[in-house]
Every structure is written in C-alpha cells, then in structure tokens.
Regions:
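Active-site-adjacent bridging/hinge elements
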Residues: 103-115, 210-225, 367-370
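Phosphate/adenylate-binding "loop-and-lid" substructures adjacent to NTP/NAD/dNTP-binding pockets
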Residues: 47-119
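Extended, highly charged clamp/arch subdomains and adjacent linkers
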Residues: 1-18, 38, 113
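Short, solvent-exposed helix-loop connector elements
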Residues: 121, 225-230, 351-365, 375-384
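A conserved non-catalytic segment of reverse transcriptases
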Residues: 302-368, 372-374
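Conserved polymerase palm-domain catalytic core
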Residues: 96, 100, 147-151, 156-159, ...
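Charged boundary/loop elements
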Residues: 14-73, 138-154
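Core structural elements
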Residues: 56-63, 363-379
Length: 384
C-alpha cells in the first residue's frame, strides 16, 4: 500500500497566528484514521511508516504545541523554568520538535495531596518534552484506541467514570447477573510497570520511548534514576499504562466463555477505569481459585502485582465502592449512590473552607462553597 502523503516540515508562514488550524487538524485526523485502519489489519510496518509521517509533519507538530500551551498545566514549568506563552515562543516550539539530537530532560518532581491525606508524586516535563510527548500521543492513540479493552474507560476520548458505572449497572442489575465481585487494586501501578515490557510491546519509536522512561527526575536538587514505571504527569503516561493493562478483558473472555463452560455458571464480567477494576463472577470460589490467579499472572508479566490487603471479594448484597460510588443490591434491586468515603471527603472539604474563612462575609463564603458543592452534585447527579 502506498503510504506517500504530502507533508511539509516548517512552511514559510508569518508566524503562529498564520497557521490554518482547520487544515492542520484535518491532516492529523486523516493520518490517525489511516493508522487505526492499519492497526485493525495488523499491518505494523504500515503503522510505523504512518507514525513517522505524522510525527514529522508540520500539522502534527503545530497541533501538539497548541495542546500543551492551552491545557490546564500550561503555566507549570519543568526543571528549566520555561513556559511557552507568546506566539513567538510557541512558533519556536514547533520548530524545535525534531528527533535528531533530541534528549529529554529530567522531570521536576512535586507532590500533590490525595484525599486520604497522603501525597501523590508528579513528574513535570519541560515544555519541549511535553510537546514531543503530545506529538507522539497523536501517533500512538489511534493504535491504543483500536486495540483497547471494550470495558476500559479511564484516560480515553469520549469516555468517563459515568460510562464505567453505567457498564457495571447494565451487567449486574439483572436477576441472573453474577453476584460476587472481585475488587482489584494494583500496587503502585504507574510506578512499577516494567520498562522491558513497554519497550517490547508499545508500537512506537523504541529509542525515543526508552529516553522518556529513563529520563529520571529531580527532587530537592538531587537527580534520581527511573528503572520502572511511567511518570505520573507525562502526557503520554496514561496511554502507556492503558496499553499495558489492555488485553486482560480478552483473556478473561477467552478463558471463561470457551466451549465446555456453561455461560451462567462461569460468566465473568470486567470493568476497568485506569488502574481500578472490578471483576464479577457467579461464585466466590470461581473468583478466588480461577479468576484471581489469571489476573495475577497477567500483571506479573508487566512487572505489576495485586495488593493483598486491598484486593477483596464481596457479595453484591453487601455492596462495593468504585469511582466514588457505592454499588449494592437491596432486595434484588440495584442502587448506586455516593460512597461513605466520598461523602466524608466532600464534607471535610466544605468544613475546611468554612474554618479557613471565619471572618468572611456570608455572600463571599457562599461564593467559595458553591463551586465545590456544585461539582460534587454534578458528579453524582446520574446515580439513584
């Protein structure tokens, strides 16, 4: 198949504002559709060639720079302290996205608070590294979306937590639905994914991927090496994590829906959002003795393991928490409502705002509380 397509490097324009964004997005979209088609046909040489064309195109570079300079992290610099704010800086960013001589800089490590009081480490790349990752994300996402598990909902276009909850409701609300639930918890998923597995299975430029994985990070002026995992904070990291976890649903379906098994007795359902997942089965024994070992073996190949303390098997009548919701059957009828932990965190946030502003006029305090209350109510508006 002929992969030739007319792609310019850096056209002679007057600057950032002269870019025809409609044409750029159309060219990128056309190449992404061709990458997805080649992936479905398993023509991997064709995929690599089309990825090469996309990542060298002016359109791809411009769209990538626009993405990283217009998202919520656009004012957060990496270790070089630079951000691309002016049109001239953005144009220079487009011109800088070349593989030749490219060497990513270490990430700037920061810690953000979690709802449980602990902190989550984030690695902040430089603007150039962010743009290069965004460029390759354009080339890798068509592959990941084509090969993704059907019931994977995290970090994917046009999918959300509400879709994951709806999927659970559709599969578990019937009388004949499986009644036992395996709540899966992967121990340090982003921090422990095997670099060897990623380099062997992710269809992109391996030398570039290795540079990103081994870039390391700076914390309190000290350089730290990275020997495993994908840094939380990198634009491409969620897609790499998703691709590492994809394939489990297919393996479960092939194992428990093959001939010789009665569908009702061995029915298994699986729903995943990022590194959180649940798996339903007809009995505790099935989940404990067959499903859990299969999942553990799948994770082990990728350098991951299930948390013994947090991975649990529960009955649907007792309910389980997933993505801030509590899913439970009451006398055979499924109800989904905010989980106790989610409600507690919400009330703590409201109390903290009130305590932090004891002298604030009521109308100003209401102005600070409203976004928090509205956000929580909006997230839970589809339940029960």
């Amino acid at each position: 198949m002929n992969t030739h397509i007319s792609v310019s490097t850096i056209p002679h324009l007057t600057g950032w504002h002269a870019i025809n964004w409609k044409a750029c997005h159309a060219r990128v979209r056309k190449l992404q559709l061709r990458i997805a088609k080649a992936t479905r046909q398993q023509q991997w040489r064709q995929v690599r060639e089309l990825q090469r064309i996309l990542t060298r195109s002016f359109s791809g570079k411009a769209v990538a720079v626009r993405r990283v300079t217009e998202n919520t992290g656009k004012r957060t610099p990496g270790i070089d302290g630079k951000i691309w704010h002016t049109p001239k800086e953005k144009w220079g960013g487009v011109c800088s996205l070349n593989l030749r001589g490219y060497r990513p800089q270490p990430l700037r490590r920061i810690h953000i608070p979690k709802s449980n009081g602990k902190t989550r480490p984030l690695g902040i790349p430089t603007m150039r590294d962010r743009a290069m990752q965004a460029l390759w994300l354009l080339a890798l996402e068509p592959v990941s979306e084509t090969t993704a598990d059907h019931n994977s909902y995290g970090f994917r276009p046009m999918r959300s937590t509400h879709d994951a909850i709806e999927s659970i409701f559709l599969r578990m609300s019937q009388k004949v639905s499986p009644k036992w639930i395996l709540e899966g918890d992967i121990k340090g998923c982003f921090d422990n994914i095997s670099h060897d597995w990623l380099l062997s299975h992710i269809p992109m430029d391996r030398r570039l991927l290795k540079k990103w994985l081994k870039a390391g990070y700076m914390e309190r002026g000290v350089f730290n090496h990275t020997n495993s995992g994908t840094p939380q904070g990198g634009i491409i990291s969620p897609v790499l994590a998703n691709m590492a976890l994809d394939g489990l649903e297919k393996e479960l379906m092939q194992t428990f829906r093959k001939s010789g098994y009665h569908s009702a007795k061995h029915q298994v359902n699986y729903v995943r959002y990022a590194d959180d997942f649940i798996c339903s089965g007809s009995s505790r024994e099935l989940l404990e003795n067959e499903v859990r070992p299969l999942i553990a073996a799948f994770m082990r190949e990728r350098g991951l393991e299930l948390s013994e303390e947090k991975t649990a098997i529960t009955h649907i009548d007792k309910g389980f928490d997933f993505l801030g919701q509590n899913v439970r059957k009451y006398n055979g009828k499924m109800l989904i409502k905010p989980s106790k932990k989610n409600l507690k965190n919400f009330l703590c946030k409201v109390r903290e705002i009130i305590k932090r502003n004891p002298t604030l006029p009521a109308w100003k305090l209401i102005g600070q509380l409203n976004p928090v209350i509205r956000g929580w109510a909006t997230y839970h508006r589809h339940v029960v």
